[in-house]
From Swiss-Prot:
Lineage: Eukaryota, Metazoa, Chordata, Craniata, Vertebrata
Chief location of this protein within or outside the cell: cytoplasm
Protein name: Protein lin-28 homolog A
Gene label: LIN28A
Molecular function as annotated in GO: mRNA binding; RNA binding; zinc ion binding
PANTHER family membership: PROTEIN LIN-28, PROTEIN LIN-28 HOMOLOG A
Annotated segments matching region Disordered: 1-31, 169-202
Residue span(s) of domain CSD: 33-106
Annotated positions binding Zn(2+) 1: 133, 136, 141, 146
Assembly description: Monomer.
UniProt superkingdom: Eukaryota
Cellular compartments annotated: Cytoplasm; Rough endoplasmic reticulum; Cytoplasm, P-body; Cytoplasm, Stress granule
Keyword Cell membrane: no
Binding residues for Zn(2+) 2: 155, 158, 163, 168
Pfam family, one: CSD
Length: 202
């Protein structure tokens, strides 16, 4: 193979450089304008497809799909699109198909966006652990989200307001070795420990 300067390009004469003025090269580098609607948009993943119904002001015979990423949306706050939302956009041809460059509402206004929001991972994790509100004891929220006024402090073990967990009589009645273990394990421990004790003779 020769060096880059010695290679010939298709359609060029020897010693002549290909010009970038060809209609094909110009068409690929220039952004194209289109309009249509949002076909679908995944708010959790942040991408979707637009259904282009007009290109450069001329109506198309059949809609054409154009990829859209949330980073290309012209709007404030959480960026997403609502299914069926009217949009105008600039786009380019890529190796994967058509991709949007900038997406706006009709006339260049902000996009409306979807009302849906992805569920927070931290919210899902803390709910699955069975955490509860320290104020009212409810399972569906935490104290900072509690709608009730501050409640009197109470024992986390027996829920009494007369003492705290450190002075709980119900917790003190449990043997120190079995605290925090379910009853099933305590029974097994008792069975094993009595079987291991040697018999005393009198």
């Amino acid at each position: 193979m020769g060096s880059v300067s010695n290679q010939q390009f298709a359609g060029a004469k020897p010693g002549e450089e290909p010009s970038g003025d060809s209609p094909k090269a110009e068409n690929e580098s220039q952004p194209l304008h289109g309009s249509g609607i949002c076909k679908w948009f995944n708010v959790r993943m942040g991408f979707g497809f637009l259904s282009m119904t007009a290109k450069g002001g001329a109506m198309l015979d059949s809609p054409v799909d154009v990829f859209v990423h949330q980073s290309k949306l012209h709007m404030e706050g959480f960026r997403s699109l609502k299914e069926g939302e009217a949009v105008e956009f600039t786009f380019k041809k890529s190796s994967k198909g058509l991709e949007s460059i900038r997406v706006t509402g009709p006339g260049g206004v902000f996009c409306i966006g979807s009302e849906r929001r992805p569920k927070s991972k931290s919210l899902q994790k803390r709910r699955s652990k069975g955490d509860r509100c320290y104020n009212c004891g409810g399972l569906d929220h935490h104290a900072k989200e509690c709608k009730l006024p501050p409640q009197p402090k109470k024992c986390h073990f027996c829920q009494s307001i007369s003492h705290m967990v450190a002075n709980c009589p119900a917790k003190a009645q449990q043997s120190p070795s079995s605290q925090g273990k379910p009853a099933y394990f305590r029974e097994k421990e008792d069975m094993h420990s009595s079987a291991l004790l040697p018999e005393t003779r009198e």
